[in-house]
């Protein structure tokens, strides 16, 4: 079975006003990591597990598996997939949570992630391929970070400096055109775009 991963590229940044990890980000990091390793060591059949708790568009509607737009956020297709998403969550989420407060941050995170899941299930209607990963929510965080700290520098791959606003625009454009041209990708670009759109509306 082919899985669609919603993963983010590696990014580094500096200049945050508070380097401590707030409770919301910490909770999400712990939950995602614990669930990943529980699934890995459980010995369960991955195809069966992902088809029930990943986001399978056709099952959300035909089988009324309405929990999938939530549970897919906590599943990842491998350690690197998990590492990238959790790194971006930690790097960009902590400043947003310090700025907004934990409750508002978590509401936004889940609004983007769940909204992206619902959008993916609509636009991917008829698909039996499970979508897994937190990147719908993570892309929403990147948008919010770009709007909140537009001129802050980040380092792509730890080397190339770029202002956050240009990075976010670039990622959005890439995801959009990739969704238009890619028909056999393991990355769910629709989920990335939807996370940003929900974040913008929110």
Residue ranges and their predicted role:
Residues 1-202:
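A detector for small-residue-rich transmembrane helices and their helix-helix packing motifs
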């Amino acid at each position: 079975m082919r899985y669609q991963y919603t993963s983010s590229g590696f990014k580094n940044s500096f200049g945050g006003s508070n380097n401590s990890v707030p409770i919301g980000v910490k909770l999400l990091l712990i939950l995602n990591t614990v669930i990943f390793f529980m699934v890995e060591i459980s010995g369960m059949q991955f195809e069966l597990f992902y088809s029930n708790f990943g986001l399978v568009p056709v099952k959300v509607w035909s089988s009324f598996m309405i929990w999938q737009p939530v549970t897919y956020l906590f599943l990842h297709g491998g350690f690197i997939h998990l590492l990238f998403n959790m790194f971006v969550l930690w790097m960009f989420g902590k400043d947003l949570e310090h700025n907004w407060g934990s409750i508002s941050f978590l509401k936004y995170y889940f609004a983007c992630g769940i909204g992206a899941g619902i959008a993916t299930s609509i636009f991917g209607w008829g698909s039996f391929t499970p979508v897994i990963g937190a990147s719908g929510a993570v892309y929403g965080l990147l948008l919010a970070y770009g709007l909140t700290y537009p001129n802050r520098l980040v380092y792509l791959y730890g080397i190339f400096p770029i202002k956050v606003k240009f990075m976010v625009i670039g990622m959005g454009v890439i995801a959009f055109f990739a969704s238009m041209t890619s028909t056999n990708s393991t990355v769910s670009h629709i989920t990335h775009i939807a996370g940003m759109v929900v974040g913008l509306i929110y």
